[in-house]
Amino acid sequence: KKGKMMVNETVREDVMDVILLVDAREVSAVGGGKDTPLEMSCRAAATYAKQLLDERNNVALMIYGESIERVDLDRGEHHLFKILTALSSAKPQGNLKLEIVLKDLLPYIPSGSPLILFSSLDDDHTISEAFTNTISRGYTITTVSPSSLDFEERMKRIPAQPLLIARIERDNLISEIRSFGMQVGDWKSDEAVNTALQGG
């Protein structure tokens, strides 16, 4: 009997509080239709939420754009439904910066909780600052980043030269985040989400 109790305690200790952050700013609508960074982020967040909840973790979802929509930490099948409902109604609007979002949220997030950010990392000059502030408080952030540049290239709206410069800037930003010791998946629109993180 004592042995059994120990097993349960070990399992209990392995349960994590995981925070999913989805970038739904206006800039996440590049591409149109089912293929936008926001659509990709929502699909990926749904996949992660299901997997984490299946493993009996507590999961919270924060969608930020014009404001922050929160689905607080919980677990179970009913909670997955709440998360999926919030993701399916996410609209690309507003331009809340990551640093402000995290400043608002961190006081409510249990310390040491892993954060998973789904964002194209576009058009946000606060990203480096947001990461360093968050990491210095003992949190880890894994980033799954659908590249909006793939969509731009397909739509041929941006000339080759500016597109190349944008790619270099994106690569530099990703390298900088990785230099903080954080994992970033540079997610191409034609690959599965788990491939992105293996590459990162």
Model-derived features: where do they sit?
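An amphipathic, basic-hydrophobic helix/alpha-beta surface used to engage anionic
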Residues: 1-74, 114-118, 130-133
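Residue-level detector of flexible, active-site-proximal loop/helix-junction positions
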Residues: 25, 68, 94, 148, ...
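A conditional alpha-helix N-cap/helix-loop micro-motif detector
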Residues: 41, 95-98, 124, 166
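Von Willebrand factor
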Residues: 75-113
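Von Willebrand factor type A / integrin I
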Residues: 103-115, 121-200
